[in-house]
Each structure stands twice: as C-alpha cells, then as structure tokens.
Amino acid sequence: MPVKCISVLLLLLQLSCCFSSGSCGKVLVWPMEFSHWMNMKTILDALVQQGHEVTVLRSSASIVIGSNNESGIKFETFHTSYRKDEIENFFMDWFYKMIYNVSIESYWETFSLTKMVILKYSDICEDICKEVILNKKLMTKLQESRFDVVLADPVSPGGELLAELLKIPLVYSLRGFVGYMLQKHGGGLLLPPSYVPVMMSGLGSQMTFMERVQNLLCVLYFDFWFPKFNEKRWDQFYSEVLGRPVTFLELMGKADMWLIRSYWDLEFPRPLLPNFDFIGGLHCKPAKPLPQEMEDFVQSSGEEGVVVFSLGSMISNLTEERANVIASALAQLPQKVLWRFEGKKPDMLGSNTRLYKWIPQNDLLGHPKTKAFITHGGANGVFEAIYHGIPMVGLPLFGDQLDNIVYMKAKGAAVKLNLKTMSSADLLNALKTVINDPSYKENAMTLSRIHHDQPMKPLDRAVFWIEYVMRHKGAKHLRVAAHDLTWYQYHSLDVIGFLLACVAITTYLIVKCCLLVYRYVLGAGKKKKRD
C-alpha cells in the first residue's frame, strides 16, 4: 500500500510540475489514413507522455484512425455522409490500378492516374471538411476547448482552415507530395530543378543533361498542369467560410512549422527553410525479442541468416503468377525467409519460406541474423532498414516508393527491380548481390551511422518543435517573406522590368543626345561650307 501511495504522489508531483511550468498544451489533430496515421500517432503518443492533451478529429468513416484504443489520446468523432467501405474501396481501387494497370516507371501513365485520384480524393476531403466546419455544435466545442496548436497532415486538406478559424498556430507533418508541390507552393521551399530531382521522377542527384531536361519537364508539368488538389474549389470554399478572398495555398503558407518525415541518410542535399525540419525515422527503435516460434525459425537458419519480405500494410496479396515467381526465387536461397503475405499459398513456396499475415518488421530488421530486406520502398520500411543497417531489394509500386529505392540504390544500399516484369532469376540474383557483396552491407551501415549520429532523436525533434510553436504562440519569425510577395515579385520580374526600362530609357537618351550632337555638328559644317 505505501508503495502505491508513493507512486501516486510521484505521478501527481510530475503532473503538477508540468502544469506549473506551463509546458502542457492542448493539441488538435487533423490526420490522414494508413501509414500517415502510424507516423502521426507516434508523435501523439510522445506528446501525451510529455503531459499534453491530444484530441484527434476523426470521421465516422475512418479506416485505421482510432481503430485501437490508444491510451491517452482523445478522439472527437464526427458524422460523415461517406461510409468506411466507400473510402476503403476508393484507396484499394487506386492501389490496384497503380500496381497492375500502369508502370511506375512510365511517367505519363503514373501522373495521369495520380491526377485523377487526387481530384477525386480532393472532393472527398472537401466534403468531409465541410461536415466539420458547418457543424456548429462541433465547432463551438472546439473553440471553447482553447487549443494551443493544430497538428495536421497537409495531404488531407482542412487543417489550415481549422487553424485559421480557431486563430491558433499550425504545424504540418508529412513525408511529401507529388512533385513537392505542397512544400514548394504552400511552404515556399526552393527546389532548383538543376540538381534537386522532383518527387515521383525516379531521378537521382547526379543527373545527366537529358535527365536534367526530364526533371525540368516534370517540374513544369507539376507547376502548370498538375492539380494541387481541386484548387479552385478549395479557394472558393475557404473564401466563403472566412468571408474574404483567400486561397488554399495562402492558408497553407501560414503554417508555422513543416515537419518532414525524411532525413539526409535518405535524401540528397537540397535547400531548406528555417521553418522546415527533418524528422524521418521517428518511429524507429531498438529491436525487441521476437515471438518464440518466430525466433526458433530465425535461429534455425544458422550462419546463412534470414531474409525479411514485406510489401507494406496496404498490399495484402499478389496475383498467383507474381506470387509464384517470387516464391520460386525465394526457394532457391540458402537463407530462411519470413514473408508477410495474406493471399493464396503459392504452389512454388519452398520449405525455407514461411508466410505470415503480420510480422514485427522493426524487430526482424534489428535481428543479428537478418541479411536482406525485400521491400516496396515505403518510407517507414526504408527508414527501419537504414536504422538497423540492412541492405534492400526494392520493388516500388506507387507514390514516393520509386524515389526512395532510387535514392537507396544511388547510395549503394539497394538493388531496384520491377515487380511486374521481373523473373525468378532477376529476384534471386538481386538477393544474392545484396547478401554476398559486402559493399551493400557496408553502405547500409554507413547510412545507419549517419542516422544515429544526430544531436537529437527525430521523435524528440518533432515534439520540441510542436512545443516550441505552443510556447511562442506560433513561429512567424521563421517564416520567409516570400509568402507575402506576388509571383512576379518573387521572381523579381518587376525589378528586372524596372532595370530594363532604366537601361532602355538611358540608351534612348544617349542615342538621342548623340543624334542631336551629330546634327548640330553636321549643320555647323554645312554652314561653314556655304560661307
């Protein structure tokens, strides 16, 4: 009993210190589904541990948000006209088309499909956002709650409008967006196309002349033809709600902080702004012990070790033909294989391969017997592999996955294959390469050391910036003046025009003076001749 009393007293003391120091705040969260939520939840758990009150806005159609009883996180559920299966089918249909109907390496096929999906998704987000903003009871409750900051994922628009209506600071958390459009046009980030490969281009930093041409064409396409959601509709909606002309990008530009889920172990060097910071790998942690059955299987591999294979949480199965191509290659490995797979058991499955509906991926990648990781290139899995120093075989499917694998290949830590066209021999040779060529393991370990050699852990950095914004009631002192300029002022076209006009006028006056002098001299000469 005394021990319990002491524990309670210590807890109360900790809470009292937190409140007395004024460091505890109230965070309102506007989230996004799937892996976006997994990353966001990691930040929210850390905020709760720091004593902050976290409230997540979730619709009644949410797929994974709040699906488990997350301790310490409050959920404010609002009704939406959409059903959960409608939203889920929309995403699954997109995933299926991206995997089986188009080639990720065919830009125009991928961009065209992504454009259609973004426009449809934009309409869904707008409807859901309206159901929140026009819900007077909910909005009154949010205003009375006196939140200190909105933490939002800009891939799901609406958070910026909430922050504006509640008159509180805004912090974004995201991995990226097609063509870096949100970071560039919403955040004011400078991305020179001469050496910064645009997102979804699949290009590296050391670009040839033709690759730079290709990169510039991609930039122009994204800037002028690709939608940043259904921008006109969002502009109109935001203007109606706020009662003044305003644009979607203008409100995005008011964000106090952009927390980008990346880091220099993955990215190529490029410019950043003061209110941008990298928090990539925030979910990574030291490996925990495996379940006993799984540990026994891993240990049975002996000195050969194991290969971990997962295509992420959104891809549960494959076609029978592709599954058998993969199974045939895996069966020829001396290593044991742990494959996350929910489809029909492949006929070619070898005795060295076990199928699992779920695997503790981080713990497996951190196991000393793990030799390689077969991945679709999702940022979460790539960062876990970097964290533990595991070389990869990449089978990118959609989104930023191609870029992630291309970056890892350029850094000598991965081999890239095409899931739709590869043969069993291709996969087998790729695995043998990353396992038997020591340079891949060495490069992976180099990236791991870079990742671990940070003054502050990524998760701690994310929490710091959110608390920083709450403490200072924003971070406008980190926001560049570019947001206050028109497009022609930003590119100094007015200054260039003024200077050209000055040069033209000066040139005109000089020429005019020369002509006058010439005429005067010529006239004087003729007069002398007549005299």
From Swiss-Prot:
SUPFAM superfamilies according to UniProt: UDP-Glycosyltransferase/glycogen phosphorylase
Record-level GO cellular component terms: endoplasmic reticulum membrane
Keywords for this protein: Endoplasmic reticulum, Glycoprotein, Glycosyltransferase, Membrane, Microsome, Signal, Transferase, Transmembrane, Transmembrane helix
Entry's EC annotation: 2.4.1.17
Superkingdom of origin: Eukaryota
GO molecular function, one term: glucuronosyltransferase activity
Gene3D superfamilies the UniProt entry points to: Glycogen Phosphorylase B
Membrane topology value: Single-pass membrane protein
Stretch forming the signal peptide: 1-24
Subcellular location: Microsome membrane; Endoplasmic reticulum membrane
Main enzyme class: transferase
Positions annotated with a glycan in the UniProt record: 69, 101, 317
Transmembrane segments: 495-511
Reaction(s) catalysed (UniProt annotation): glucuronate acceptor + UDP-alpha-D-glucuronate = acceptor beta-D-glucuronoside + UDP + H(+)
Function, as annotated: UDPGT is of major importance in the conjugation and subsequent elimination of potentially toxic xenobiotics and endogenous compounds. Acts on small phenolic agents such as 2-beta-naphthol and 4-methylumbelliferone as well as bulky phenolic compounds like 2-hydroxy- and 4-hydroxybiphenyl. In contrast to 2B16 it is active toward octylgallate.
Database matches in PANTHER family: EG:EG0003.4 PROTEIN-RELATED (PTHR48043), UDP-GLUCURONOSYLTRANSFERASE 2B4 (PTHR48043:SF12)
Sequence similarity: Belongs to the UDP-glycosyltransferase family.
Name of protein: UDP-glucuronosyltransferase 2B13
Protein species of origin: Oryctolagus cuniculus
Gene assigned in the entry: UGT2B13
